[in-house]
Amino acid sequence: MTVLTIYREDLPEQPLTQATDGAAEIAALLAQQGLRFERWPAQVELADDATPEQILAAYATEVDRVKTEGGYITVDAVSLRPDHPDRAALRQKFLAEHIHSEDEVRFFVAGQGLFSLHLGDHVYALLCTQNDWISVPAGTRHWFDMGSQPYFTALRFFNNPEGWVAQFTGSDIASQFPLLP
């Protein structure tokens, strides 16, 4: 279930607002902050071990639309499972607050991940689940938690042919907010 929890940056133990699984409500709250959120319908039933090519083919219509709208030049599919040998190191890398010089655009084909967005003096923690699509504007301070036992498959859209390139802020704010188990 998709959940958006909003906190003041100085009160990580006290949520101000929580929206649960109402795509329209979540999209409206995020749009007020300049972010886009959509829920895409499942196109086909994909096997847990589906290849990146099969995943991209299953969502070809949506992928083409987003590439055209956003001018994205590359799209890939990434999967992480609990048995991935580098899961702990990858989790730590993404948990550090960072920004990008391009939009960070993700679609969750399966599983879940927690995007925490540091917007002004608030933190918007969005638990993305299957069929959720999010676009985080360039320059937005954020971090991502995949959990200690990650399970997700996501499409990633890029303007930069180098792919995921982060500029870390040096802030420890991510360590103050709830994480996935």
Swiss-Prot record:
Pathway: Amino-acid biosynthesis; L-methionine biosynthesis via salvage pathway; L-methionine from S-methyl-5-thio-alpha-D-ribose 1-phosphate: step 5/6. Binds 1 Fe(2+) cation per monomer. SUPFAM superfamilies: RmlC-like cupins. Keywords: Amino-acid biosynthesis, Dioxygenase, Iron, Metal-binding, Methionine biosynthesis, Nickel, Oxidoreductase. It holds the Pfam family ARD. Its cofactor is Fe(2+); Ni(2+). The record marks E97 as: May play a role in metal incorporation in vivo. Fe(2+) binds at H98, H100, E104, H142. GO terms for molecular function: acireductone dioxygenase (Ni2+-requiring) activity; acireductone dioxygenase [iron(II)-requiring] activity; iron ion binding; nickel cation binding. The keyword Transmembrane helix does not apply. The keyword Oxidoreductase applies. Its EC number is 1.13.11.54, 1.13.11.53. Ni(2+) binds at H98, H100, E104, H142. It catalyses: 1,2-dihydroxy-5-(methylsulfanyl)pent-1-en-3-one + O2 = 3-(methylsulfanyl)propanoate + CO + formate + 2 H(+); 1,2-dihydroxy-5-(methylsulfanyl)pent-1-en-3-one + O2 = 4-methylsulfanyl-2-oxobutanoate + formate + 2 H(+). GO terms for biological process: L-methionine salvage from methylthioadenosine; L-methionine salvage from S-adenosylmethionine. Catalyzes 2 different reactions between oxygen and the acireductone 1,2-dihydroxy-3-keto-5-methylthiopentene (DHK-MTPene) depending upon the metal bound in the active site. Fe-containing acireductone dioxygenase (Fe-ARD) produces formate and 2-keto-4-methylthiobutyrate (KMTB), the alpha-ketoacid precursor of methionine in the methionine recycle pathway. Ni-containing acireductone dioxygenase (Ni-ARD) produces methylthiopropionate, carbon monoxide and formate, and does not lie on the methionine recycle pathway. Belongs to the acireductone dioxygenase (ARD) family. This is Acireductone dioxygenase. The lineage of its organism: Bacteria, Bacillati, Cyanobacteriota, Cyanophyceae, Synechococcales.
